């Protein structure tokens, strides 16, 4: 049966839709929450695409199960990848990045700084930073621009689909997951 499905812990669930292309699924509040699994059996990447409209909010659920937004994009298709040395399609990503020294109070401030230097904003342990590049080894990263870092246990990168353009990073070690 055609429709919009979600993979859940209890199996595949139909969210809505029908056999007709012009009939949109009835998704409560127009929101589908997507989480990532971590561990030895986790996938390296997940592709997300919106058929109608655009935009994704990035965040985590706090201890009260309230969504805390830490970033966003207007893109209609993104790939979320584990921040490791990984190849997704024709694109190769590395686990090492150059982190600039400044911290920022908001996603918007970090995004503005990232735009001026060719980097991307990162939510890093409760604050915002800017990182540049994605390198397969620490030696490949140009350390003169900042500090060479690698991501934590649950670090992920959000990439514009089918490109190597990193839009956002999330790195809270093993304390939080995007």
Write out the residue ranges for each language-model feature.
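Conserved, single-site charged/polar hotspot
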Residues: 1-178
């Amino acid at each position: 049966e055609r429709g919009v499905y979600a993979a859940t812990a209890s199996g595949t669930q139909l969210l809505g839709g029908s056999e007709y292309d012009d009939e949109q699924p009835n998704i409560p509040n127009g929101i589908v929450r997507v989480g990532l699994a971590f561990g030895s059996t986790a996938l390296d990447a997940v592709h997300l695409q919106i058929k109608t409209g655009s935009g994704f909010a990035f965040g985590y659920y706090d201890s009260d199960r309230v969504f805390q937004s830490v970033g966003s994009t207007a893109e209609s298709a993104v790939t979320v990848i584990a921040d490791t040395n990984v190849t997704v399609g024709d694109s190769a990503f590395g686990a090492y990045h150059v982190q600039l020294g400044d911290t920022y109070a908001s996603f918007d401030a970090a995004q503005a700084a990232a735009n001026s230097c060719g980097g991307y904003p990162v939510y890093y342990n409760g604050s915002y930073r800017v990182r540049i590049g994605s390198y397969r080894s620490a030696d490949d990263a140009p350390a003169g621009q900042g500090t060479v870092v690698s991501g934590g246990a649950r670090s992920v990168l959000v990439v514009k689909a089918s490109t190597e353009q990193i839009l956002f990073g999330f790195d809270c070690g093993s304390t939080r997951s995007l």
